Amino acid sequence: MHAIMLKAKLHRAEVTHAVLDYEGSCAIDGDWLDLSGIREYEQIQIYNVDNGERFTTYAIRAENGSKMISVNGAAAHKAKVGDRVIICAYAHYSEAELASHKPRMLYMAPGNQLSHTSEAIPIQVA
């Protein structure tokens, strides 16, 4: 049996560009791709915190250190500059892999400053 699990997440990144007349995709600062383990051309899910939109696209590399999150093509209708988004990648894991799986999560502060990284989400308390 395999399970689809969270592989990587960029939490509350700010959209820096929304380019309708681009080929599609989401350009992400190359440093963040490397740190999160998201691969170029990998399918990603984007959840817009500000307007509730949820959509699928693929990641492309933006210049390292640029702090860029560029939502391109038709997806540019679903996010505007300044929107806060959660970008997730998921993967299939075998039962054996699940025992040691830990997602890579990057948490962003305002201005797309990397706040911290984590491999676990704290338990939610009532």
UniProtKB/Swiss-Prot annotation:
Q: Where in the cell is it found?
A: Cytoplasm
One GO cellular component from the entry? cytosol
Does Cell inner membrane appear among the keywords?
no
Q: Supply the InterPro entries for this chain.
A: Asp_de-COase-like_dom_sf, Asp_decarbox
Q: Which residues form the active site?
A: 25, 58
Q: Which reaction does it catalyse?
A: L-aspartate + H(+) = beta-alanine + CO2
Q: How is it modified after translation?
A: Is synthesized initially as an inactive proenzyme, which is activated by self-cleavage at a specific serine bond to produce a beta-subunit with a hydroxyl group at its C-terminus and an alpha-subunit with a pyruvoyl group at its N-terminus.
Q: Pathway, according to UniProt?
A: Cofactor biosynthesis; (R)-pantothenate biosynthesis; beta-alanine from L-aspartate: step 1/1
Give the CDD domains listed for this entry.
Answer: Asp_decarbox
- Pfam families, per database record: Asp_decarbox
Residues modified as Pyruvic acid (Ser) are 25
Q: What does this protein need as cofactor?
A: pyruvate
Nuclease found in the keyword field: no
UniProt keyword terms in alphabetical order: Autocatalytic cleavage, Cytoplasm, Decarboxylase, Lyase, Pantothenate biosynthesis, Pyruvate, Schiff base, Zymogen
Q: What EC number(s) does its UniProt record assign? A: 4.1.1.11
Q: Which GO terms describe its biological process?
A: alanine biosynthetic process; pantothenate biosynthetic process
Name the positions where substrate binds.
57, 73-75
Q: How is the cofactor bound?
A: Binds 1 pyruvoyl group covalently per subunit.
Residues annotated as coiled-coil are none
Q: Which GO terms describe its molecular function?
A: aspartate 1-decarboxylase activity
Q: What does this protein do?
A: Catalyzes the pyruvoyl-dependent decarboxylation of aspartate to produce beta-alanine.
Q: Hey, which family's this protein in?
A: Belongs to the PanD family.
What PANTHER family has UniProt attached to this entry?
A: ASPARTATE 1-DECARBOXYLASE
Subunit architecture: Heterooctamer of four alpha and four beta subunits.
* Protein name according to UniProt: Aspartate 1-decarboxylase
Gene source species:
Pseudomonas aeruginosa (strain LESB58)
Q: Provide the organism lineage as a comma list.
A: Bacteria, Pseudomonadati, Pseudomonadota, Gammaproteobacteria, Pseudomonadales
